[in-house]
Amino acid sequence: METYLQTVRDEWIQLINETDSLVHQLTAQLASDHASGLITEFYRVVLADPHVAEFLTTEQVERQLQEALRRWLVDVLSCRVEQVDEQIRAQQRAADVHARIGISVDLVEMGFRILKKLLLPLINATPHPSETKLSIYHYAINSIDLAMEVMSRAY
């Protein structure tokens, strides 16, 4: 594995290992419980952008992309140490697909930003103490950022 990917792999493993197991569990559960709604809202926002509409149709989103993104979100936010290598490969494959169909890295990054923005109200609506909510958000955002970094690098 190249040095860069080894560094990201090590950071991802460190993030998982340093995250309280309850926070990891709550984050995975949040993703599982709310992924479909998050993804529906995500595509509502994304498809309103005229530049994105050049690449995606509502039919494509409904037929293929919603389920793929739902699975991606759940997989990233529930990733365990033994799954990190597969997650890195999954991000590289996702980058290949995005590049092949002509979706630029800036649009992918916009999508990540929107997804992270949509997570905050969901986390804040949970009944957990503020410190736990902050830990969930920290873990979720850093997990998404690591996935995004691998994906961007693969472009």
Describe the role of every protein-language-model region.
Residues 11, 21-25, 41, 51, ...:
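Exposed alpha-helical structural elements
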Residues 34-42, 65-69, 107, 111, ...:
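Residue-level detector of well-ordered alpha-helical segments, enriched
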